[in-house]
């Protein structure tokens, strides 16, 4: 079963990390990811740019409004995600727990994927 693991953190805290601290955190995360990748359980992994780089499309009528900037009203922002393929929710939660141990703060939301197509492979 495919699961999405969404990574949330206070963006201002992450952006304030020194380059050395950021590289150390990323190295810890890579160490958690590597065994899952070798086992064929880890799909795409993405670290998103800050919300200041976001553009939002909002449909409240016609036409769709395209707006610069983030509009989430949250204390933590979505900073990245993983797409994983585990047999059980417990396995996905265990992986999310390991990611949390490697990352100083934030939250990891695990959600089962309801629909998935990889258009690069569908053709």
Task: Describe each region flagged by the PLM.
Residues 1-123:
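Conserved, structured core segments of small domains
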